[in-house]
Amino acid sequence: MRFFFLLLPVLLASMVSFAQENPYFVTYDHHMEEPGNLDLEVSATTDVPRAGQKYYFAPWMEFEYGVTARWTTELYIEGQTTYGDSTVFTGWRLENRFRPMKREHWINPVLYLEYENLNEASRIQKEIVGGGSDVTSPNSELRNTSAHELETKLILSSDFHDWNVAENFIVEKNLSKGEGFEFGYAAGFYHQLATLASGEKCRLCRENFLAGVEFYGGLGSTLNFSGRNTGNYVAPVVSWLVSDNATLRFSPGFGLTHESSPVLFRFGYSYEIQGIGSSLSQLFGRKR
């Protein structure tokens, strides 16, 4: 774990590119990472707890790489700290997104497959399936319960002028237990606040901001397919291109059910390194 934090400044200083992340935290659209580019992101989820619950802070790191124009792979490393309890490492995830069609269409499908090696203390809530995360049990109990899970998503996404609309249907299977399937959803829209550049070098100008809203939550399981008794949220989202290669994102998510936290706060910082794949290929090619 310490290796990644030591390596991060070196990677950030090596190369730059122009990129702006979409503002979603849970919903996926059809835009893939550029081939050969590496996107590094540090994000976190925290909440306003209900009575009897404890405040937590759940950070994670993402390493997203564009393998081809239609295939993006991503590694997540996560943990969490619960106030008055402890700090724990909660596991890792490896996701792959595949875009079947090369050209833009009215609706653009993306196939998503993720393997998760987590424990039950995970609270980043990158998605919500079933009834949602356990935020009441102590970490000492949750960290000893491992879960090897396989998650799939059908992503449908469309661009209309400067607007994006996306819908995700989520299915997750716990491979460690003889459980059924759990379901969830995410959907959202966003747009660029201005499509014409101001003509000035300005980071606070409207063209550097994307804003929208996303909706996400659980849909129960094969035992009880329902949106009731699950966590559900509506969340304004915004991203700000703070430099040619870095983006800040923020989102307050408001709980719609008693099983939801009253508010989930999410924030993230991403930095894209252009052409790292070809640079590494040339480096190792010269050593042969």
Where are these regions (language model features)?
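Transmembrane beta-barrel domains of Gram-negative outer membranes and organellar outer membranes
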Residues: 19-288
